[in-house]
């Protein structure tokens, strides 16, 4: 069995790490490189960096910090933000990123997933999905351009359909960003994760809602996700990664202990 992964998420805007609640009202957390170094030293299995306004601004992720991060950490990291071409992806990978993640650009042009997978291999192509639960309809819908509140829009895709579509097109991994839970710290949306797990045959990463160590355990045990991504509990030092992994190990979760 592959070890489950603990993945701190660093949302980047204007060269700094920020964090919001339900993708709104972002506050500055700190500088990118020191935070990345701290999480690597604490025992993170991987890091994810989202340049949250790149797609909505019509630009690609600012690459200046990517190579600096690669110099100071020795764990894999994934970069996302406005990657719309093979050239964009190639540059970011050449600066030291291990994976690239696409979200809004994949919705705009789904063939991008296949072209990236064919060029660089499925193992380094992640598709992020920003999913919102509509209580009125009881359905999960995919959102686009979520880094900018004024430009966010609901797409025609229902989440389960898009999960299946991106796999057909070559996604090597899926990060499910559950917008209703984001930053609230009330736990991952286990119902949604279980439904997605049934149709997701590539590694599935849960994102949005972690507030306690038990929330991570539930995601691994009850929804069988491959990784759990979180931000605010790590940024605000509510949970220490090393202590979290030790706890999960005592609960029988296959995890890499640092």
From Swiss-Prot:
Q: In which pathway does it act?
A: Amino-acid biosynthesis; L-histidine biosynthesis; L-histidine from 5-phospho-alpha-D-ribose 1-diphosphate: step 5/9
The record's comment on protein family reads:
Belongs to the HisA/HisF family.
Can you name one GO molecular function term for this protein?
imidazoleglycerol-phosphate synthase activity
Q: Could you tell me which SUPFAM superfamilies the record lists for this protein?
A: Ribulose-phoshate binding barrel (SSF51366)
**What EC designation does it have?**
4.3.2.10
User: Which UniProt key words apply to this protein?
Assistant: Amino-acid biosynthesis, Cytoplasm, Histidine biosynthesis, Lyase
What top-tier enzyme class does this entry carry? Answer: lyase
Q: What InterPro entries would the database entry show?
A: Aldolase_TIM, His_biosynth, HisF, IGPS_HisA/HisF, RibuloseP-bd_barrel
CC terms in the record's Gene Ontology section: cytoplasm
Q: What is this protein called?
A: Imidazole glycerol phosphate synthase subunit HisF
Q: Where is the active site?
A: 11, 130
GO BP, sorted A to Z = L-histidine biosynthetic process
Localization, per the record, is: Cytoplasm
Cited function: IGPS catalyzes the conversion of PRFAR and glutamine to IGP, AICAR and glutamate. The HisF subunit catalyzes the cyclization activity that produces IGP and AICAR from PRFAR using the ammonia provided by the HisH subunit.
Give the catalytic activity: 5-[(5-phospho-1-deoxy-D-ribulos-1-ylimino)methylamino]-1-(5-phospho-beta-D-ribosyl)imidazole-4-carboxamide + L-glutamine = D-erythro-1-(imidazol-4-yl)glycerol 3-phosphate + 5-amino-1-(5-phospho-beta-D-ribosyl)imidazole-4-carboxamide + L-glutamate + H(+)
Superkingdom, taxonomy of origin: Bacteria
């Amino acid at each position: 069995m592959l070890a489950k992964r603990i993945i701190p998420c660093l949302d980047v805007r204007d060269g700094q790490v920020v964090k919001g609640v339900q993708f709104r009202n972002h506050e500055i957390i700190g500088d990118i490189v020191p935070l990345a170094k701290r999480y690597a030293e604490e025992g993170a299995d991987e890091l994810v960096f989202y340049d949250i306004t790149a797609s909505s601004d019509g630009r690609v992720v600012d690459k200046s910090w990517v190579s600096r991060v690669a110099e100071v950490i020795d764990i894999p990291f994934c970069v996302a933000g406005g990657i719309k071409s093979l050239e964009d992806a190639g540059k970011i990978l050449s600066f030291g990123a291990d994976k690239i993640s696409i979200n809004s650009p994949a919705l705009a042009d789904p063939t991008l997933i296949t072209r990236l997978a064919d060029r660089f291999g499925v193992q380094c192509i992640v598709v992020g999905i920003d999913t919102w639960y509509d209580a009125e309809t009881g359905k999960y819908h995919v959102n686009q351009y979520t880094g900018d509140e004024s430009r966010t829009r609901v797409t025609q895709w229902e989440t389960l359909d898009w999960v299946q579509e991106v796999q057909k097109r070559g996604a090597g991994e899926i990060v499910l960003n559950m917008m209703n839970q984001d930053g609230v710290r009330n736990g991952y949306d286990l119902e949604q994760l279980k439904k997605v797990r049934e149709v997701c045959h590539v590694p599935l990463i849960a994102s949005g809602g972690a507030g306690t160590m038990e929330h991570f355990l539930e995601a691994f045990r009850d929804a069988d996700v491959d990784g759990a991504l979180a931000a605010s509990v790590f940024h605000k030092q509510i949970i220490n990664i090393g202590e979290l992994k030790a706890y999960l190990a005592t609960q029988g979760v296959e995890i890499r202990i640092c």
